[in-house]
Regions:
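Single conserved hydrophobic/aromatic residue that forms the stacking wall/gate
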Residues: 1-12
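Nucleotide-activated chemistry modules centered on ATP-dependent adenylation/adenylyltransferase
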Residues: 11-231
């Protein structure tokens, strides 16, 4: 167990929060729930899990809406996260504050969020404490909290496996790590007639295209949901 001086600043942050909400999507790596329960133990606080009652998965959304991705974001974000969050907010009317995971290197993104969503209150604990994502992972490790396995596999975030917003390098890594997901998404592209990647279908993607280490794919979080509000 870490010494209290190490643990205290981070656990007290969450003890001052009324409720921690987690929007679950079945396409996420199952290890995400392990991480969630480990956080509950560390923080001594139950995390509320909410999930779509209308759609069962990203695949369900793609196949029923006949849409994979758009310039305004992927429909799975709207159906599986945005609408689920909005339903929870309607059932819990109040003035909510959103806590963002942007790190020290993402101040510009934080500024854009505050300007675009001025009706909400926002907190950026990593930026306020001068922490990068890597340093946050290091703190978690010192606290005995194992980060989600997708990071250890070389992915830049813990999005769903087979995120429609992924680029060439991402999809070529999915092809290797999760071939069944790659094949299913490639089939869905052909059935619908649109691709995840602009200009190329997955079944035409050359295995050496792209570099996941240099590509930018945002975390599929509330940021995706709020910044496409009304689109």
């Amino acid at each position: 167990r870490p010494p209290r001086s190490t643990l205290f600043p981070y656990t007290t942050l969450f003890r001052s929060v009324d409720e921690i909400i987690y929007t679950h999507v079945s396409n996420q790596n199952p290890d995400s729930l392990r991480f969630l329960h480990d956080c509950e133990k560390l923080l001594g606080k139950k995390i509320t899990i909410i999930q779509s009652e209308e759609y069962s998965s990203v695949d369900d959304v793609i196949e029923r809406t006949r849409c994979i991705n758009t310039p305004f974001g992927a429909p799975c974000t709207d159906k599986l996260k945005k609408r689920v969050r909005m339903k929870w907010e309607r059932e819990h009317p109040d003035h909510h504050t959103y806590v963002w995971g942007y790190d020290l290197n993402e101040k510009n993104r934080a500024d854009r969020v505050c300007k675009a969503l001025s009706d909400y209150d926002h907190e950026f604990p990593l930026i306020e404490h001068g922490l990068t994502k890597e340093e946050a992972h290091g703190i978690a490790d010192k606290l005995g909290l194992k980060r989600p396995i997708m990071y250890d596999m070389g992915y830049p975030n813990n999005n769903c496996i087979g995120c429609p917003k992924g680029r060439m390098g991402y999809w070529n890594k999915i092809r290797v790590d999760f071939p069944e997901v790659f094949e299913r998404r490639a089939r869905q592209e052909r059935e619908i007639g649109h691709s995840c990647i602009n200009g190329v279908f997955l079944d035409e993607l050359e295995p050496d295209r792209g570099n996941i280490n240099t590509e930018i794919i945002e975390d599929c979080t509330i940021a995706c949901q709020l910044l496409t509000w009304g689109k």
